[in-house]
Amino acid sequence: MNKLLLAISMLFAAIVVNADNNTSAYYNSETECLGVELDGSQTLRVWANGRNKTDAVEQCKKNAVNEVIFNGIKNGNGGCNKKPLITEVNAKEKYEYYFNIFFKDDGEYKKYISMEDSRTFTKKRLKRSEQVKYGITVRVNRGDLQDRLIKDGIIKQ
């Protein structure tokens, strides 16, 4: 009986010692509003995964523009426009060719992103097995982006 109790105790101790203390699964990785500038641009905290830092940061920039266009910014201090630029149902699929070109690497989306609000320590890093997850602060020029989408016939005025 003592040996069985000792074996169960050791097994329990081994499980407790090897428990994963990783808190990254609980980290909020939704885009959030940090503020709105007088020119209508929105300062956002955006998260993305990538193979390395460069990939993750580039994906963050794409995610920021994508959120403003298709989802609106619902989290954060509430200053950002919660309404997406495109409210049409299935617009992403309807204009897939346009947005594939728009969001390609070094694509047109970069014209509407600014890193002016990035400061030291504004990048946060979480490491996973094969990928890294970064959160950065970016500014999206919503007004110019809206003008571009109107000019290109994606949204109506």
Q: Language-model segments: which ranges?
A:
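Domain-level marker for long, solvent-exposed, non-transmembrane regions
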Residues: A19-Q157
